[in-house]
Amino acid sequence: MSNTLTPLSIQRVKDGFAKQGWEYDDAGEFAIRSGFVGIGLEISHIEPNVNVVSTVAVDSIGADRYEDVRAWVEQYNYTKAYPTVTALKDVDRGITALGAAYTLPGHWGYTDAQFESHILTGIQGVVAASRDFLAEFAPEVTQRLNEVPQEG
């Protein structure tokens, strides 16, 4: 592992995934998609930052729940340092969804250890926020996710 400060890139993310033995799918030149404990996410390099994002939408959380979800995300953002969560209302589909994002600023370099730690923190934060949202608004989905055997 290098102690040299290195700029951010999607290749560094891929290298970290390979080191951990994690699977991912390429999602274009600057992004990958993966999932952890039933939560899908995308990691992208949008110069100069690396972003870990997820959108969680289930049919059981209707558009009529938007105000409830918005109040929940306001409280979540107030009490958590990361990730940032947003209530999303899709009137056409009749659902309210959650957006969760963690951004690793890229205006300076990171050692390999720092980079891996930040990416892991981002993944853990986005997954935890997504599962907290589901536990609050769609506990039946959380229960089903918990019943699915996890690869390991």
Residue ranges of model-derived segments:
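Glycine-rich and polybasic anion-binding loops at the starts of cofactor/ligand-binding domains
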Residues: A100, A128-F133
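Short, highly charged C-terminal tails/helix-capping segments
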Residues: L134-G152
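Generic recognition of long tandem-repeat/solenoid scaffolds
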Residues: E29-G35, V52-V53, L98-A100
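A short acidic/glycine-rich loop-to-helix N-cap element
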Residues: G106-T121
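A short acidic-to-branched-hydrophobic micro-motif
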Residues: L41-S60
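Charge-rich, low-complexity N-terminal segments
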Residues: M1-I46
